[in-house]
Amino acid sequence: IDYLKQRGISGEIAKRFHLGYAPAAWDTLLKKFKNSEDLLASGLLVEKSDRQGFYDRFRDRILFPIRDRRGRVIGFGGRVLTQQEPKYLNSPETTLFHKGKELYGLYETCQVNRQPDRIIVVEGYMDVLALFQAELPYAVATLGTATSRDQIVRLMSSTQEIIFCFDGDIAGKKAAWRVLEQSLDLLEDGYVLRFLLLPDGEDPDSVIQKQGRDGFITYLHKAQSLAEFLFAHLLVEVDLSQLEGKARLAKLAIPLIEKVAAGIMQHKLFEQLAALVNMDVATLRQVTLNNKNNSVKTMQKKLKKPRVSMRYSPMRLAIALLAQFPQIVKSLSEKQCNTLTRLELPGSELLLKLFFLLKQNPELSSA
């Protein structure tokens, strides 16, 4: 309780999220519930390395229950109160809990508003609590992993606007770009995706602690649209003052834009690209179409290469004939046999070996 108070979390928020505490003992759950099979299956127990018993997975940690859409607890996140590592520990994958599909705080967000206008995606449990505490009750967190495609789909089924919030360091920028790449082919007209990169080393919790609710909202208003983030990221790699830079930007951007479903959003992205490379949209789209057609034609040519007919040399035919009809050896005269021994053609050595094998073993057949 003291730790939560130090972090600015009220009793009301702790109650809303059903925060708990796992005692430091190694056998609290076994003493309380006895049934080790269910506890093991749910990930709350860990089997000892010598297989001689079990111990509690979560010890001396604040517990964050993770709920599914119906509010059922399917897993836990645990935060240490000491310097113990790891700082955060999640339930393992179980039949109920798949951390790549779940989002902490989504149930609580939808309890406030069944169809929220927007959802902020953050990286930590405490970030979610801090945002709810600051009366911004539309925050969810990934569960210690990179944002997955399944999580993006789940978010899109819950709201029309998603704001992905990351630390502004290199790792945060890379994580944000991965989210953008995974989102493109899911994006349809009507959805809004924005990207908020906080100052290096900051997260929503720390911003609210230092600058309050208004400080975070100021950052929120600066969140980049998908188009702004996409082109800002790509422009770092090119020099638009050079013709080659414009061509490279188009080469990098077009495959990404084409992943977006055909519609207004895709057209607007092409418009922005056209403006950056000083082309009109129609010409840019035509170049894209021509490149596609050329790629298809090249592939078709590769697929339609004429078969090369297999031509057999006389020596190869002789070996095949002898192997198929070994009785031929009996009909050859001594003079013909001597002629065979003087052959110096590719494959003649194999022909002679086969000939003498059949000569010495007349009972051999092609079978």
Model-found features: residue ranges?
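Conserved catalytic cores of soluble enzyme domains
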Residues: 114, 145-200, 207-213
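Structured, non-catalytic alpha/beta "coupling" segments that mediate domain-domain communication
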Residues: 57-79, 205-212, 216-218, 279-283, ...
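Conserved phosphate/pyrophosphate-binding and hydrolysis machinery centered on Walker-type P-loop NTPases
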Residues: 19-23, 57-59, 122, 239-250, ...
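Non-catalytic interaction/clamp surfaces of large macromolecular machines
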Residues: 1-15
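Non-catalytic protein-protein interaction segments used by genome-maintenance enzymes to assemble
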Residues: 229, 290-363
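Phosphate-handling DNA/RNA-contact segment within nucleic-acid enzymes
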Residues: 23-158, 162, 175-176
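Terminal amphipathic helices with adjacent charged low-complexity linkers/tails
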Residues: 14-21, 266, 271-299
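C-terminal or mid-to-C-terminal helical accessory/interaction module adjacent to the motor/catalytic core
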Residues: 190-280
